[in-house]
Curated annotation (Swiss-Prot):
GO CC term, one of those recorded: cytosol
Catalytic activity, EC: 5.3.1.9
Name of one Pfam family that matches: PGI
Active site: E282, H303, K417
PANTHER family with a match to the protein in the record: GLUCOSE-6-PHOSPHATE ISOMERASE
Family that this chain belongs to: Belongs to the GPI family.
An example Gene Ontology biological process: glycolytic process
Protein name: Glucose-6-phosphate isomerase
Pathway listed: Carbohydrate biosynthesis; gluconeogenesis; Carbohydrate degradation; glycolysis; D-glyceraldehyde 3-phosphate and glycerone phosphate from D-glucose: step 2/4
Top class in the EC scheme: isomerase
HAMAP family cross-referenced by the UniProt entry: G6P_isomerase
Gene3D superfamilies according to UniProt: Glucose-6-phosphate isomerase like protein, domain 1 (3.40.50.10490)
Length: 426
């Protein structure tokens, strides 16, 4: 199960005093989250989703997948929360060197003609389908990609057969994409109206790609459900998600920290870090408040950003995501003719060495006046992906409400869109 280690912050904060001070406020916010009907109806469709998850929907998705047994590629079209959760879950659980069938590829998450042209070339001799994800259908990046990929798939299979290869995840009642799907006769899946994109990983937005990627969705939802129960505690001392949220809040408001870095030590967590960045940045970056969130993947980034973190401006704190046990591992061999001077690690696994690097780095950074939280999970499996993703969602809600902002909207995103459309439209 997940463990939150706060030993790396005690030199920087009077933690006991602060927990006593903020426990009543956190209890009040918790009650608001779970009892405010207006808030729940508008924004919190994700909050109790693990409790009421519709497993019949998974069977519907499996039937759809089985209808295309020879599919080589599913192209998931989306941006922001419409693709980050799916990408995070798939890369959390799969090795990059063992491709599943179908392979899950992504489009519509940028405007790169080079990327899309090469994707089309890759798909030319493949058996493929599309899952386009957008609540409204008006977000430019995925809409552009869908226009081009829709044309391509219709030219390859013919319009009638192509419509059985296009799956639409969108609003249930309204929107350009829904209207298009109904007119064309595409299979549709629903994004609940009360679930924002960055909180949508356990809806059809994430689950359909997970099913096509052959992930264990049932175990994932068991993990999310356990996380729901564990974070349902209104008592701060019994709720690790709320402790994490409070620590973030205190470093930002009382220690004047400007940035949080999520530190991981496994490449499988690179896309999870991107999902985490969107979750917190889009939730808290309002009213000139909020931490700037970044991510490092060590030990790679110890040879680039590590210098700044150790001795640069003391503007940040770190949250280390530690996976304590790795399924697939390497052992360093012993060599008699030791020309490389590495026999001091002979017999050790890569995981054991990686853990020593993690421990040494935390110690060095704490001594370098960089506060360190540590979140430990036992392994990289579907259960712990579900647990961890829900943990961060709940922590994010508490963290934003502690700041006094609404963590569930994102009006700032619309500003660049307005200016972009003004430049693009005649």
């Amino acid at each position: 199960m997940l463990k939150l280690n706060l030993e790396g912050i005690y030199n920087f904060l009077d933690w006991r005093k602060h927990t006593q001070t903020y426990a009543p406020q956190i209890k009040s916010i918790h009650q608001k989250l779970h009892q405010d009907k207006q808030l729940k109806e508008k924004y919190l469709g994700w909050l109790e989703l693990p409790l009421h998850f519709d497993f019949k929907e998974i069977e519907k998705m499996k039937q759809l997948k089985n209808f295309h047994p020879n599919l080589d590629v599913l192209v998931v079209i989306g941006i922001g929360g419409s693709y980050l959760g799916a990408k995070a879950g798939i890369e959390f659980l799969q090795t990059p060197f063992k491709k599943t069938k179908p392979e899950i590829l992504f489009a519509g998450h940028q405007v790169s003609g080079n990327y899309l042209t090469n994707l089309l070339h890759f798909l030319k001799n493949k058996n493929w389908a599309i899952n386009v994800i957008s609540k409204s259908g008006t977000t430019l990046e995925p809409a552009l990609a869908f226009r081009i990929l829709k044309k391509e798939i219709e030219e390859k299979y013919g319009k009638q057969l192509a419509k059985n290869r296009i799956f639409v995840t969108t609003d249930s009642q309204k929107g350009v994409l829904l209207n298009l799907a109904l007119k064309e006769g595409y299979q549709t899946f629903v994004i609940p109206d009360s679930v924002g994109g960055r909180f949508s990983v356990f809806t059809s937005v994430g689950i359909l790609p997970f099913v096509f990627a052959n992930l264990d969705v049932a175990s994932m939802m068991k993990g999310a459900l356990q996380s729901y129960h564990d974070t349902f505690q209104e008592d701060l001392l019994q709720n690790q998600a709320y402790k994490y949220a409070l620590a973030r809040y205190l470093f930002h408001t009382q220690q004047n920290k400007k940035m949080e870095i999520l530190v991981s030590y496994e490449p499988n967590l690179l896309s999870f870090s991107e999902w985490w960045k969107q979750l917190f940045a889009e939730s808290e970056g309002k009213e000139e408040k909020g931490l700037f969130v970044g991510a490092t993947n060590n030990s790679t980034d110890l040879h680039s950003l590590g210098q700044f973190i150790q001795e640069g401006t003391k503007m940040l704190f770190e949250t280390v995501l530690n996976v304590s046990s790795i399924k697939d591992d390497c052992v360093v061999p012993h060599i008699l003719n030791e020309l490389d001077n590495l026999n001091y690690v002979a017999g050790k696994t890569y995981s054991q060495i990686n853990q020593k690097i993690l421990q040494a780095t935390r110690q060095a950074h704490i001594e370098g006046k960089v506060p360190n939280l540590e979140i430990v999970i036992p392994t990289l499996d579907a259960y712990h992906f579900g647990y961890l993703a829900y943990f961060f969602q709940k922590a994010c809600a508490m963290s934003g409400l502690l700041l006094g902002i609404n963590p569930f909207n994102q009006h700032g995103v619309e500003i660049y869109k307005q200016k972009m459309f003004a430049l693009l439209k005649p």
